[in-house]
């Protein structure tokens, strides 16, 4: 295709990218034509190291032949099955395989095609479950500030990030929010472990204020992305598990980002040894080769939806592409790749090395906190590490670092106050070194610029 035509303003203005202002994008457009391993290549032949797996998605790496061949073989057999009337062999096999790797008795799976679909489905499942088990008044959902659960209206209502939802308010009724465990900047001005996980106890306080008989579910990301990779302190998730159990509230993990090896285990629920009632999965579920997502839930929940057609207890939810055979084939191959190549262990090993290298960034005097587990890491930038004072908002320090890194050939997830790294789980030590070298150079230049 004609490169000049692809990057021409009149061509790009017809396209709407996610969360981007196109007038800014067309000034320096990034049009990628191919990818391999941990590398992208744009239409001009420039190579870019993928430091965030596309968008926390390509866990098994780009141009993975096992996944590609599995999808190709399925294309030769059947591309689409009627989701209202039937299923397909790869969908059945994928659900079986997933039941073997999900924690405890999360054995039943509803296949979907995107993360927002998964979180929507999880919250709807929770509400319908309570209605069908004699608790129709349990409809409210508790989530966390800074959390992001998707772009559809229900998922957005659970989202606690103001700039993602302001334009669409009012959002739906029945969604409540609490503070996440941002230990580096505790909103309660407490210090772990002396705090006795006070932030978890505020969830129970809210439940008691609202009335447990009105709360259907608590939904959260085990490791929060928005806010700069927010890590739960030891015992936090276990405490929430106990609270939800005591009040007969379903605990939902949004593992769209953290699933499939990202945190060093197949799921973050296993990394932190605290199992939810419903687990949302997506992104790394197929490594992005075909859109795929799903929810896995406990046997006791599944039992409430089993019956004859005349009982009308089936889960009242569905999507055209849910359980698509191409997506299921990709998911099966992806799961095999993660297991046979030991990518969970690799995530732990390379993640430790990544965080060790990130510590070197403290020499610049602008690193406040380094957070993460497995191949999921965040760096919070501060103007003064001693006082933890943030940069002046007008400096947009993290954005400048991220854009500088992209110019140098490294793709990251950046925000005014932090930057995140989550490369494909196949990344090598040498590629990790290169990633950190580029990031280091980018920070050095940005510091020099703002202090000039």
Please tell me what each predicted stretch does.
Residues 2-452:
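Conserved N-terminal phosphate-binding loop of PLP-dependent enzymes in the Aspartate aminotransferase
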